Amino acid sequence: LTQRDLSVLKRKEELTQEQKDSIAAVQRIEEEAYETAKEEVDAALAYAPNNALFGSSSYRIPFPTGLWIYNALVGKKSRFAKWLFDTFAGTPVFISTVNPKTRALVAQNTLRNYGYFNGTVDYEILPEKNPKKAKISYTVRPRNLFRLDSIAYLRFPAVGDSLIRETFRQRTLFSGDPFSVINLDAERTRIYNMFRNSGYFYYKPEYITYRADTIQRPGFVQLQVVPADGIPASANKRYYLGRTTVNLFNNDSYELTDTLQFRDYTLYYDGGKKGKIPLRFGALRRNLFYRKGMLYRQDIMSFVQQQLSEMNVFSTVNLKYVPRDTTALNDTLDIEITGILDKPYDGEFTTKVTSKSNGQIGPGLSFSMSKRNAFRGAEKLKFEVHGSYEWQTNSTVQGHSSVINSYEYGTSLSLDYPRLIFPGARKFSRRAK
């Protein structure tokens, strides 16, 4: 609320529609923030007591049979007593186990994480008539909610500052919103991803910090987003992609005896006696959506990792980035791709029983054999043999000839190709240049 809004609260007849909307918006924001904080505080304080109902921290079963059995049979040695104890006894919940002091402290910190900086959480142990029993009472006082006032991004390098301004509409922090560490973490993650997608390979989330002032304007937070102190020089440098090395291992051999050079790519593989590459370079190259000299981008390289995994020819595949050299002037990362080819063959045997509405019932069998990377282009060739037999179990016509039994058998051959073959569609295959 502005000072003018506060001054007219007692004179409702003087409120304009704009002021009413402003007050309603603030109330709605505070109610939502309160419900969110309440849910988190309840979770921090919740602990199922003795004879809890379905694990509830508030509702209990009237008769604590679990505790009765525990008290009656604890320490008994007979086999039946041990079985009864293990099956039905309930472990007693002690005050020391609940640790109300720590829970109250956690709940109080939770309030502050959601903008209730003056909030407090106290607890009291309430003894009952039975000296062995007690209850815990928590008192939560959230008090006033702090909201964001000014938000400034300071001390970032010139390029980083320009990137922040270009993506300003994507921010998660807005003036007037309740203070929330969830939103702070979301903004830190957003800035981190922005830097990583703009060439800053060594940038980390912890390089982004916050400074907050709650004194200048009561009830509000003057927030500054600043880089952390002591950031290494490599984190403030943009990196470009260099040469690519591919280590292609067979599933039964970890030797690389052959080499293939193609422009900026070097492939090491085991060609065996025939010297053939186990996976054609073209099939691999189609999934490398980058080129030499391109600025490093985390989103594109993550997509490359995903596409290589989805080729379904590797048991494991990973990307490694190696600095061209260790000098301060270096700004190039070479890529090293290491993949281990999966076993070439898969077999599957399936049985089934079918029952139809026309009264036919019977078993079915199928066996399929698949070969990965069948033609060294990430294809999958599958051959299947199947058969089934069905009996008619009911017939409205008398006589042996009225019963109709049927059988089916056959084979199928399929080829899964990792790329659509369509004239003129080549330009669409490199969708992430």
For each feature predicted by the language model, list its residue ranges.
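Interaction-mediating elements
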Residues: 1-310, 332
